[in-house]
Amino acid sequence: IYKPVSTLITQVRVDPFDAAFSYPSKEIGRFMTEAEAKKEKDKGNHVKEIPGKGYQRVIAAPRPIEIYELDAIKALMDAEQIVIAAGGGGIPVLQQGTRLKGASAVIEKDVTSACLAESLDADILLLLTGVEKVALNYGTSTETPLDAMSVEDATKYINENQFSSGAMLPKVEAAVSFASSGNGRKSIITSID
């Protein structure tokens, strides 16, 4: 089956008062020595020590509010194009009057995907990852793969810290957000295999 593919740079509005700006937590960039980390701090950047690896910059990871190119995405889909949008979570921007300003932040790509799927009134959100199934107690001798879970169970597992913050947690949070956003909506987290 042949279909044309369009890629679209996607600007995503975030709230300047999102708590994530007060508590930067998303690790970015290379690992640094203590001296390099001090220079970064002197520039006004946030730095976090990563045990056994050194130091790394951290920036805000606010929640997406609105995808500005939504009309363009819909038009391309109506033209039967395969649309690649919101790559890497999109470009975080702040609304300032009638202008947009880039935000020093990153947006979790899975959360942006849920926002986009909801905005497009999709029925299913498919999140691909490196494992076939979400698991409880991942990487331990009591690891339990899950075939399915309800929004209530997923929320309970999130509150129990069952999912790694850098890997599975954003996917499960996005799945819960999307599945909760309308009747009959489902989220699937699996590998491409």
Regions found by a protein language model. Give the residues of each.
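Short, flexible segments with low predicted structural confidence
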Residues: N45-E49, G87-G89, G139, M149-S150
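Ligand-binding beta-strand-loop-alpha-helix segment within the catalytic cores
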Residues: I1-V83
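Polyanion-binding loop/helix "lid" in catalytic or ligand-binding cores
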Residues: I1, A60-S119, T129, P145-D193
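Short acidic, glycine/serine/threonine-rich loops at helix termini
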Residues: P16-Y23, L94-T98, L136-S141
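Active-site pocket-lining segment
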Residues: I124-S141
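Short, glycine/serine-rich, charged loops/turns that create anion-binding
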Residues: V12, G88, E132
